[in-house]
Amino acid sequence: SYRGIKDWSDVMQYVFDDRKSQMLTLEQSYRTTVEIMSKANRVISRIDALRPFMGKPVIRHGEKVRLIEKKSFKDIVSDILEKIDKSREEGYQSIAVICKTMDECKAFSDLVRKRGRTLDLITGKEKEYKGGVVIVPSYLAKGLEFDVVMIANASSMRYEVNELDIKLMYVSMTRPLHRLYIYYYGELTPLLRDSKDSSGQEGTAF
């Protein structure tokens, strides 16, 4: 699960008991780019116990992560729809809008519908992901991968400095193969604040 296991030594002790067992750590990340992985690692490094297990990307460079500030959630929805259209024109087929909670996903979906469009919403009841453009809550995103990911709301009111939010942000940031956009309005989450460019320009690469 997205919560994860805190101490694998307990698993080895109580599950495998006296049987011979060995713990191996898979550190290499083959999904995402150096630029994306380096930013995600800065988030997960806030959990001291996970620092030794931070992902090491294969040497595949790509675009820098884009941090985009908007005045409201409605403005975020509008900009994301434009980015989706542009990404598809550029040939990207699998695109995900990741919201923190299911309620936020539904709010996003409702605003999209008011604009005369629909996007598939992943609820966890699906047997498989068939591709295309989807909206997915952060806690269901683990194990999935997409060409492009847009984190819809990385505001401080959504992501605080606690272990659960750190893990959810990390999972969300490590889903894309090629391109990552992170949106927020109001105050940016402290998890990313040290990465924000002082220029404050829309679409700041960081």
Language-model segments: residues:
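Conserved helicase motor core of SF1/SF2 NTP-dependent helicases
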Residues: 1-134, 138-206
